[in-house]
Regions:
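Short alpha-helix plus adjacent loop in nuclease-associated cores
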Residues: 77-98
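Acidic/histidine-rich catalytic cores and adjacent linkers
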Residues: 2-5, 9, 13-17, 24, ...
Length: 274
């Protein structure tokens, strides 16, 4: 549509994977209309919301749906860990090696971003995975901070995968945070301190193992539509194309007048989308 970033708020049903709400902007006021377009029974049936760490969104949900459980998205937690811990330690280690004159080690670790964030299967059968794992083991033995970061990431992933009880999740998360603070790795300590503030939302993943991964997958389809629509200045028509893109094959969906009145849509948006 335009250059630079323009954000929108998207709500998707985790079961049907169909969009429920789409609005231009990512502020709290852009999320508020979602709670006025469906019936009271619909909102009472909502048990949990999975979202990123946008405090404005969580504040709106807490105020509008006090009975709803907010789940801090696993995808964004691990993404933050990769960016704020693993990549930060990798860059710091690369700069240290350059100052020490170890240029080969510096270049090797600078080019290992994908390798350091890769999650290997429990049983490795692929030869390329074997060689990559051996290379990772060598780098971990040469650098203590990287070794700690990789092991702590694996413990965090195992915690998300294995815990389906809130008490066990809370205990495991508290233990993980203590280990992170005692590690002595500055990036890991800062990460643990920040995420400790969202402990309850992280623990809620044990009660409702959902994430915004569905939305992240939908974003790939929306990005394709955005490239096709580059130069088009009608956001209402662009949003209509997004609604249409997620229709199941062989079905029809009537767009609610009330939904599109919120977007100030033109008459074309009030027709049936096929």
């Amino acid at each position: 549509m335009e250059r630079n970033h323009r954000y929108a708020t998207l709500v998707i049903d985790a079961r049907t994977k169909l969009p429920l709400y789409l609005h231009r902007g990512n502020a709290a006021k852009d999320f508020e209309p979602f709670f006025t377009i469906y019936s009271k029974e619909f909102y009472k049936a909502i048990k949990a919301f999975a979202m990123d760490q946008n405090t404005s969104y969580s504040g709106v949900v807490g105020r509008r749906l006090p009975q709803c459980t907010i789940v801090c998205d696993y995808f964004h937690i691990m993404k933050n860990y990769s960016e704020q811990v693993t990549d930060a330690v990798r860059r710091r280690t690369g700069r240290l090696f350059m100052r020490l004159g170890r240029k080969d080690d510096a270049f090797r670790i600078r080019n290992a971003a994908r390798l350091l964030n890769k999650r290997f299967p429990v049983r490795i059968t692929d030869e390329s995975d074997w060689s990559a794992r051996l290379m990772l083991d060598v780098m971990m033995k040469k650098n203590h901070d990287l070794d700690v970061c990789i092991h702590m990431r694996e413990r965090l992933q195992d915690l998300y995968d294995s815990c389906r009880d809130a008490a066990a999740m809370a205990k495991g998360w508290g233990l993980w945070c203590r280990m992170a603070k005692e590690s002595g790795v500055p990036e890991l300590v800062r990460f643990a301190e920040k995420k400790r503030l969202r402990q309850q939302e992280i623990v809620n993943h044990a009660l409702f193992p959902i994430s915004s991964g569905t939305i992240e997958g939908c974003m790939n389809r929306i990005k394709v539509l955005k490239r096709v629509s580059f130069g088009l200045r009608d956001y209402d028509y662009f949003f209509l194309r997004i609604w249409q893109a997620f229709l199941p094959e062989g079905t029809y969906r009537t767009l609610s007048d009330k939904v599109w009145d919120d977007h100030m849509c033109t008459a074309c948006a009030k027709e049936d989308a096929a």
